Amino acid sequence: IDTLGGVDAIVNNAGIMPLSLIKSGRIEEWDDMIDVNIKGVLYGTNAVFNHFMDQGHGKIVNISSVAGKRVNPGSTVYSATKYAVDAISQGTRMESAGVIQVTCIFPGAFVTELAKSVKDEAVIEMFMKRGLGKIAQPAEKVALSIKYALEQDQGVSINDIIIRPTAQEM
């Protein structure tokens, strides 16, 4: 902020998804997910919060997941981190008392690098059966939802956007 003179918006989009079953005990992967998916959003939000409050406006877009709305076998820890993103979004919205526009986006199956981080064979098999790779849509569609949220004037707040392929079950 000191270098560039100001910030009007931030998109907290970093995330990892090494899905696994609880019984697999992949604690290191769970810790990494918590560090990136929760702490990353917290630290990014904190980096701009006071600046936005001082200037009287700002926009925060947090990327969660449909896994932050529904838990599936193998996604327990990942879902917990994405539920946390929603909680951070709601809390930030309340703490800013209408000064900061906070949007939480919940993408479904889109073409990204996330699935490559899954190492648990049982989870890979479950996901293959669900066929999510076949219905995944281009990530640009999520980018358009981010753009939509950022284009709103100060009088409008888009709180939540759930975006998923039509063929994907919620």
Predicted regions and their residues:
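C-terminal helical subdomain
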Residues: 104-105, 124-169
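Substrate-binding pocket helix/loop in short-chain dehydrogenase/reductase
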Residues: 21-22, 29-34
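Active-site helix of classical SDR
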Residues: 45, 81
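Residue(s) in the substrate-gating loop at a strand-loop-helix junction
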Residues: 65
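Conserved amphipathic alpha-helix within the SDR
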Residues: 1-6
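Active-site-adjacent segment of SDR/Rossmann-fold oxidoreductases
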Residues: 70, 91-100
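Active-site loop immediately N-terminal to the catalytic Tyr-X3-Lys motif
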Residues: 23, 70-76
